[in-house]
């Protein structure tokens, strides 16, 4: 009897350890960057989520550039995005007298954050700017069609542009909506069959049979909807 009790206790401990590993937050870089940008006040000028800049009186373009579309007019690559954040200007723009004059006419100007965010924070911010801007865009025609479809279905409303964000989700196991390009996706979707189950039913058969997983899925604020009749 004592052996059985010890065995049961061991199984319980192993189960708790396994679930603790699954429950450990694993935010993708773009989401870490979004949260850092929010904490740092970036959206005060670049607008909600950085996609709609506020008015900037005195400038010919009238507004602070947003990350969605406008960003590639000012930053051609990741290094230039880093320069904007770290130095408040790219090396290319800094050498332009006309650009400096235009900047000085504006009421608002990009601050130079220097080393405030560290290399990891800087990389996370770059990841978020790219996600908000839709970079890199898919090159494969099937991937392009899929991206257009998930935008049409509203999937990006919770998962963010390209499925790369992880917005807060109170009540869920990890406290956020899982992204499609992070570690969470592999834990939730093991194969194509499970992907279809999530899409059709809002839950996989594996998770539906697990009372612990079902408990957290049911108490989450936004839950994955069933799209059986709309995804085709």
Identify the residue ranges that each predicted region occupies.
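N-terminal export/targeting leaders of redox proteins
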Residues: 1-35
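C-terminal capping alpha-helices of c-type cytochrome domains
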Residues: 19-21, 26, 84, 109-138, ...
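Periplasmic/extracellular electron-transfer cofactor-ligation site
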Residues: 34, 38-63, 89-102, 134-135, ...
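Short, solvent-exposed loop/helix junctions and linker helices
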Residues: 39, 74-75, 116-119, 152, ...
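Conserved beta-strand positions that form and line the central face of beta-propeller blades
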Residues: 66, 109-112, 179
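Structured beta->alpha junctions
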Residues: 71-73, 114, 184
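An amphipathic alpha-helix signature
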Residues: 78-86, 90, 119-130, 189-200, ...
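Interfacial juxtamembrane loops and adjacent helix segments
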Residues: 104-106
């Amino acid at each position: 009897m004592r052996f059985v009790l010890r065995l049961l206790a061991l199984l319980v401990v192993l189960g708790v350890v396994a679930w603790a590993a699954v429950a450990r937050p694993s935010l993708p870089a773009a989401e870490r960057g979004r949260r850092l940008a929010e904490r740092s006040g970036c959206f005060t000028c670049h607008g909600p989520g950085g996609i709609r800049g506020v008015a900037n009186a005195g400038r010919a373009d009238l507004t602070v550039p947003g990350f969605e579309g406008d960003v590639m007019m000012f930053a051609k690559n990741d290094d230039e995005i880093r320069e904007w954040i770290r130095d408040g200007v790219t090396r290319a723009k800094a050498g332009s007298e006309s650009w400096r004059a235009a900047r000085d006419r504006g009421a608002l100007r990009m601050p130079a954050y220097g080393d405030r965010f560290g290399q990891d924070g800087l990389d996370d911010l770059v990841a978020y700017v790219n996600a908000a801007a839709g970079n890199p865009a898919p090159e494969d025609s099937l991937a392009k069609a899929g991206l257009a479809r998930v935008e049409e279905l509203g999937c990006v409303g919770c998962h963010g542009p390209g499925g790369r964000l992880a917005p807060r989700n109170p009540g869920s196991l990890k406290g956020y909506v899982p992204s499609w390009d992070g570690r969470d996706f592999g834990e939730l979707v093991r194969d194509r069959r499970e992907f279809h189950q999530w899409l059709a039913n809002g839950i996989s058969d594996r998770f539906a049979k697990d009372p612990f997983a079902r408990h957290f899925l049911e108490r989450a604020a936004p839950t994955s909807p069933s799209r059986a009749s709309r995804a085709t």
